[in-house]
């Protein structure tokens, strides 16, 4: 179920303050966050935000195409190593 429009997008307060502080600077600073549930807003465009995946911080460069998505969508928490191999070929 989608979030109500009158509530607006969710973004953690500390992350929002860091975004506003770094948007006026010329030097690009990587912002680290644990908030995977925060929505990407237009003020974040052209910033690099490192999102924690449970093990390390994954840098995500924000473009206009990513606005409206959640930060956690671009920081996978699980590694897929493939399905189990079948040993039937080697048994004969």
UniProtKB/Swiss-Prot annotation:
UniProt keyword Endoplasmic reticulum present: no
InterPro entries per record: Ribosomal_uS19 (IPR002222), Ribosomal_uS19_bac-type (IPR005732), Ribosomal_uS19_CS (IPR020934), Ribosomal_uS19_SF (IPR023575)
Protein name as it appears in the record: Small ribosomal subunit protein uS19
One GO-annotated biological process of the protein: translation
Its job: Protein S19 forms a complex with S13 that binds strongly to the 16S ribosomal RNA.
GO cellular component, as recorded: cytoplasm; small ribosomal subunit
Family indicated by similarity: Belongs to the universal ribosomal protein uS19 family.
Lineage: Bacteria, Pseudomonadati, Spirochaetota, Spirochaetia, Spirochaetales
Cleaved signal peptide residues: none
């Amino acid at each position: 179920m989608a979030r109500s429009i009158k509530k607006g997008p969710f973004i953690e307060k500390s992350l929002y303050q860091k975004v506003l502080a770094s948007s006026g600077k010329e030097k690009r600073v990587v912002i680290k966050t644990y908030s995977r549930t925060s929505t990407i807003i237009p003020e974040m465009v052209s910033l690099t935000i490192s999102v924690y995946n449970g093990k390390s911080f994954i840098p995500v460069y924000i473009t206009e195409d990513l606005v409206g998505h959640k930060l956690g969508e671009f920081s996978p928490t699980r590694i897929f190593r493939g399905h189990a191999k079948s040993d039937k070929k080697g048994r004969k």
